[in-house]
Amino acid sequence: MLLILELLVLIIGLGVALPVQTHNLTDNQGFDEESSQWISPHYYPTPQGGRLQGVWQDAYTKAKALVSQMTIVEKVNLTTGTGWQLGPCVGNTGSVPRFGIPNLCLQDGPLGVRLTDFSTGYPSGMATGATFNKDLFLQRGQALGHEFNSKGVHIALGPAVGPLGVKARGGRNFEAFGSDPYLQGIAAAATIKGLQENNVMACVKHFIGNEQDIYRQPSNSKVDPEYDPATKESISANIPDRAMHELYLWPFADSIRAGVGSVMCSYNRVNNTYSCENSYMINHLLKEELGFQGFVVSDWAAQMSGAYSAISGLDMSMPGELLGGWNTGKSYWGQNLTKAVYNETVPIERLDDMATRILAALYATNSFPTKDRLPNFSSFTTKEYGNEFFVDKTSPVVKVNHFVDPSNDFTEDTALKVAEESIVLLKNEKNTLPISPNKVRKLLLSGIAAGPDPKGYECSDQSCVDGALFEGWGSGSVGYPKYQVTPFEEISANARKNKMQFDYIRESFDLTQVSTVASDAHMSIVVVSAVSGEGYLIIDGNRGDKNNVTLWHNSDNLIKAVAENCANTVVVITSTGQVDVESFADHPNVTAIVWAGPLGDRSGTAIANILFGNANPSGHLPFTVAKSNDDYIPIVTYNPPNGEPEDNTLAEHDLLVDYRYFEEKNIEPRYAFGYGLSYNEYKVSNAKVSAAKKVDEELPQPKLYLAEYSYNKTEEINNPEDAFFPSNARRIQEFLYPYLDSNVTLKDGNYEYPDGYSTEQRTTPIQPGGGLGGNDALWEVAYKVEVDVQNLGNSTDKFVPQLYLKHPEDGKFETPVQLRGFEKVELSPGEKKTVEFELLRRDLSVWDTTRQSWIVESGTYEALIGVAVNDIKTSVLFTI
C-alpha cells in the first residue's frame, strides 16, 4: 500500500514571516545596517549533546542505551506534551511504557509547588536575592526540592533569571533574584543545586529577554481579550551582542555550570525571531557557547512553528497545543513531528538528540521517575476524586488528590529565615526600631496591606490584591498555600504580648478615623503595597506589568494623613519591586521605613519579628530605587502599524541597567543597589589582593569534542506502518498522540530550509565554549581579595560586605562598575573577621564582539568594598 504523509506548512513549516538570510556578526551583533533592523543570525545544526569531555558522560551512556532501542513514536512521545489538563500536572509528556518511563510531570514554579494542596509559598526570588545570603539560597532550593519531590514532581519550573529585572515596572521581576546578573547567577546556581540534590530537575527560565509582559504574546482573544487585536507578533527584545553576554546570558551560564537539567525558552522574540525557534540563541549561545547538555522546553504554547523550531534546537513542546488552542488536539509536534521525521523534513538525528537530551538530563539530575514517585495531586481540581483526565469527562473517575503535606520543620524554618533576612531597613531615625515596649504603649496599625483580603487567599493564581502581599500573581505563584500569616496577626500578637493598647484600621480611603486615632498613638505602623504579576491576569488595569510605580490603595495619602498626626510613623512597604517613595521618604514624622518583597506564607511573622526586634534586619536592596521615575527603563506600550512591537530600550541602555546607569550617569538614587541599614555599626578595612592564577588576555583553546554518535536506525523512516495508531487503543479527542493515522499517503516533504542550514556537526568547540557554562578557564579563580570587617554594635548580627569591580580607565572597552562579590557574615559584638572574595576569570572579562570571545584587558583594576554600590568603605588596586 502506498502511504502519503502530508506536511502542512501551517503546522510544520517555518511559521514565521521573517527573513531567513544568513547574517554576518558585527560590533552590534543582531543589528543589520543595511535594513536598519535587528536580526538574529541563523546557526545550524543543533549541537549534539553528550560530546563534552568529562561532562554528563554517565548520564549520556544510560540515555543512549535507551534511545537506541526506541521507535520514532516513543521518541516523539518524550518531546511533546499530552495537552492542557490531560494529566495531573501543568505539563505532562507522553510515556514510554516499554522502558518503564511514565508521563513526566512538569510543575510550576519558582516560589513553590503551584496548584497543589498543603504546599508552602516561599519568599519570592526577589526577596531571596535581598538576603545576599548564599547559604540561604541553597537552603531555600533544598526546601523547594523536598516539597516538589514529596508531591511527585519530576521537573520544577524554576528558578527564574529572566526577567533580569532591568525594568522597574516589569510584572514578573519578583520571580527572579534582583536587577544584577551576578547576584542572579549566584542565587540561581545555589537554587538549582538544592532542587536537584532532592532528585527534582530544575528548569531555569525564561530564555531570554523576557523583560516585560505586555505584548509578550501575539494577539489572541483566548489568551488575553485586552491585547491590541492588531498585535500580530510578540514583542521583540532587541539586545546588542555585548549586553547579551555580559548581562542577560550571564545567570544562565551560572545555571548551566551548576548542572541545570532544562532551560525554558520564552514567548517573546529576540532580535525579531521567536525565542523558541531562534537558532542563534538556542543552538549557538546556549548549546554551543555555554555547552548546555540538557533540553530546551517551550514556555506554555510559546512554540510558534514545527520543523523550524525542531532544527533551531527546541527539544520539548509544552503543554503540546498551539497558542490559544487549548484542548483542540492540535499541535506543531506530536503526530506532525512524527510525519516530519518520516518524510525527512526533520532529520532523525535531531529527534534522536531531543530524546537523548531529555533522558540524559533526567539521569544527570537523579530525577528519573520511578513507580513510587508519581504525582499525588491534580492541578485542576481540589476534590479528592475526579476524572483521570480533567478535560475528558468520559475518562474514569479515580483518586486524583492524596492530600500529601510536603512540609516539615526544615521547610518551615527555611521559609521564615529567608523572609526575615530579606527585609531591608531603609530609614531608622531616633532609634525608632526595634519597637521598645517601654516607649510605645499605644500602637496603631493601618493599611489594607496589613490584613487579610476579604476574598481570602485562594483566588486564581494569587490575584487577590486587597490585603496583605504574599506573592505576585500568575503562574509563578503557589496558588493554594497551606496558610498565610498577615502582618496584622503577628503585630497584634506582639502588641498583646507586650501589653500595649492596640488598634487596627483597614480603611485607606476615608482618612478621618485613622487621622484621629493616629494623633493619640505613640507609634503608627502603616503597611502599604504595590503588586504585579503575569500578563494573562489583568488587575486594576495592570496587564502584569505595573502601569506606574505608585503605591496602591491610596497609600501615599494614607501615609501623609497618619504622619501629620503621629510623630513616630513607621512605613512598611510590601511590593514586587521599586515604588515611588518621594512623597514621604523625607517626612520628619516618618521615622522608619522598611521594605519587604513578596515574603511568602510567613510574611506577617517575618515583618513583626523585625519590627519588634525578635530578628535583626540584614537585607539589602537587589535593585535601585530612583528619585525620579524618568530614570527607570520604561515598559514599551507602543504597537506599530505592522503589529510587530519592538523593545529598543534594551539596546538603548545597552550595559547601563539599574545601578550601572545611575553610577555611569552620576545620578543620585533615593536608595542605591545593595543598600540596607542595620541595628549595628560596622567597620570595613585593610583590603588586600593576591593573584591566584596568571591570566592571559585570550582564553585557552577548549578540549576537543568527543566523537559524534549515531544510533544507525535510519531504516526506521522506511516503515511508517510502525507509527500507526494502535487499533485497540481508546482515543481521547483532545489528547496529543505521536501516532499516524493509517489512511495517510506518503510523499516527499517540500520544505524550504533557511539559508546556511546544515546537518554537519562541529569537530571542535568555539573558543568561548567547550565546557558547562562556557570555556572551563572562565571559571578558574584569578585573584583573591581579603577585607577585615568588625561589628561595632551591641548585638550579634549579620553583615554583608560587597565587592564592586572597576575596570581599567584606559581600556579599549568602556565597562561600568559591577558587582563581583558578596558574603554574609555573622558577627558578635566587637568581633572581627577576615572575609575573602574570589574573582574568577569571567568576573574580570569583557565580551569582545569582534573576536567573539571573552578577553581580559591589561591595566589597573580596582576592587571596591562597601555596603552599597555608592557607599564604598575601602578599596585595593591590582594590575594585570
From Swiss-Prot:
Keyword Transmembrane attributed: no
MF terms in GO: beta-glucosidase activity
GO BP of this protein: cellulose catabolic process
Active site: 299
Residues forming coiled coils: none
Pathway membership: Glycan metabolism; cellulose degradation
InterPro entries: Cellulose_deg_GH3, Fn3-like, Glyco_hydro_3_AS, Glyco_hydro_3_C, Glyco_hydro_3_C_sf, Glyco_hydro_3_N, Glyco_hydro_3_N_sf, Glycoside_hydrolase_SF
Assigned keywords, A-Z: Carbohydrate metabolism, Cellulose degradation, Glycoprotein, Glycosidase, Hydrolase, Polysaccharide degradation, Signal
SUPFAM superfamilies noted in UniProt: (Trans)glycosidases, Beta-D-glucan exohydrolase, C-terminal domain
Signal peptide stretch: 1-17
UniProt name for this protein: Beta-glucosidase 2
